[in-house]
């Protein structure tokens, strides 16, 4: 039996023998293609070759391309673990012809590789092929040259509601290269349900697509016209995991060698004996996607690719939690994965330490909120109406506890509860609107603003200047005039306004004439011009008008102090933590400064105190801030540090504060460090694996922050009737007392529950020899129901327990069944039937299930129904 690695290598060897160049897999992060979130097909790295924009030294290529489908248009995440073939990560084997061979060779290559005893040796009678309905050429090649009988060839027409919209017609987009395709299907046999491609039962598991050849022979124009390409090309794909399942005679990809190795590794780590547990599948799949994404440079974050990675990690951690994980485990799978992936695992071996460190940090970070978030979700699920979790709750889990929507959906899916996704999106939209409300200007002008020439920035030495309007933009387009009340972007020939760059926010202020006032809320750079973003509050303005541009001086001074303090902070971090500290991002505003930097571990309190002391010492030294312009090589020799993400020309601006801090910087700065006044760190934490963030305030804001802290301290002391100097001791005393009280209360609850349980044991009925407890309970908290059910099951050893209770006019139902009886009486089935009696829905596992309802007056009938239902089953 061939292993996955052997099949991968045999594919590459076969096509190499046919004159193809073996091209390494490209990164999962697409290069120079903003349309793609992740590499999701073998042809991605050759897109420009197919479009004629790039030439390669070969016309035939073959690859084993790693791909991810999670997030964006191609998102398989919610199905992973629950189906036989959905994955977040997969390998796509491919062979490509760039104007070289076409249909004859492409079809014969595929058939030879699949059926020749020298290669895969699949039985020919097990294979079926599809062709586009009008592609007679491909049909004839299959039938007359390859010899596939007509009853094994299926024509597929336009089955997606439009011309050329078909499972057997591929297009790169609405316009551009496109063409028919032919697919090969493997028949798993009559023991599996499913029909041939094109039949109503085509989605079954019997006939599985294993090969797809796209014939790029047309160029579709905007009017729908199909032009023949001068050099037709071929793009072939074979899913490695699917083919491995075929070759290893299993119907699920999760039964193949790689997944079985990973599943057993997870089970061993977490002491799981049931190897069919779907959570094992989820973890085994997700470690592949996460490891390769990190190896290709993706870092967990809250946006873009980083957020997709974070979602996958958190879903894996949650399923680990279901499997009983008590501590970080996910990162421990990396060495096994690197080994079992064979040659494709070399990149994992090279970056193993980094991958493991990143995974462990993210797992531990999420573990701190997972338990609290799950508790909130469990509570919310007991109160759902119409079997739907509100979008508001789902958003709170996302926003407060870091639960991606698909993780919440996972939990709900297990209870047969849906999520109000429209409500979730409404909450998300509202948050986005709040975030951008301060700008009063929502249009994206990056691709709209086109003005000849450039804006001369004169704001280092001037906060006001005369200027001429050379461009006006409003409502997403260029205009000649704006009227009072309109939001707009004004372009000036020269300006004292600093445009957002290098982490420093853009200036605000006023653009005016004798009769007009334009309030500038922000300043952004568009190419070589500065855009002054805001609203005209009086009069009208037109292109060519002479205006006075005045920066908000108070705000600029505060921003300037924070920028200079950021430079001091950077140097202090390197002095205390080491030279590995490198800037990864920053924000310099009037209210706060934020600095992201490389640092593999948390910073201790003593280190933070030392960093703060160093910065304030440099402020007290009142160092002269020097600004010089020089060529880039001279700046490097001077020891100047470059800012993260900035591009520099041949001539640069160097900001120095003696030898302590020398940086390349285009921002605004104080004249002397003493102008900063005071520096106070206010927060420190991780933003991603290996990246920390500190936030600080300066000058008047720092003094105000200290005043507020003092006020809180004094108010706390007064509230606790203690002196501020002994406040910590007083709080410790109260905490100790609270713990004792809580312990006593829990002991009392346990005692009462035990007494109630003993009484309920006595009241157990025998139905056909089985202990059955069906009771309506009073004054019992919902969260205590599960504990009581478990206690009764343990005491009775073999029993069926049904409880109903009413709280806040809502019915809560719970059913527990011991393992020996769950095959006869399914708890999820019973609680679902009961829920219908009380106007609700619910479900769960065979041994434990909960439901809710909105008709408490029908609870007695529901409990009576339960007794009759159980009796019928027994």
From Swiss-Prot:
E.C. code: 6.1.1.7
UniProt cofactor note: Binds 1 zinc ion per subunit.
Reactions performed catalytically: tRNA(Ala) + L-alanine + ATP = L-alanyl-tRNA(Ala) + AMP + diphosphate
Binding site for Zn(2+): 563, 567, 665, 669
Superkingdom, taxonomy of origin: Bacteria
Classification via SMART domains: tRNA_SAD
GO MF terms held by the record: alanine-tRNA ligase activity; aminoacyl-tRNA deacylase activity; ATP binding; tRNA binding; zinc ion binding
Domain remark text: Consists of three domains; the N-terminal catalytic domain, the editing domain and the C-terminal C-Ala domain. The editing domain removes incorrectly charged amino acids, while the C-Ala domain, along with tRNA(Ala), serves as a bridge to cooperatively bring together the editing and aminoacylation centers thus stimulating deacylation of misacylated tRNAs.
Cross-referenced NCBIfam families: alaS
Family from the record: Belongs to the class-II aminoacyl-tRNA synthetase family.
Role of this protein: Catalyzes the attachment of alanine to tRNA(Ala) in a two-step reaction: alanine is first activated by ATP to form Ala-AMP and then transferred to the acceptor end of tRNA(Ala). Also edits incorrectly charged Ser-tRNA(Ala) and Gly-tRNA(Ala) via its editing domain.
Name of the protein in its database record: Alanine--tRNA ligase
Lineage of the organism: Bacteria, Pseudomonadati, Pseudomonadota, Gammaproteobacteria, Pasteurellales
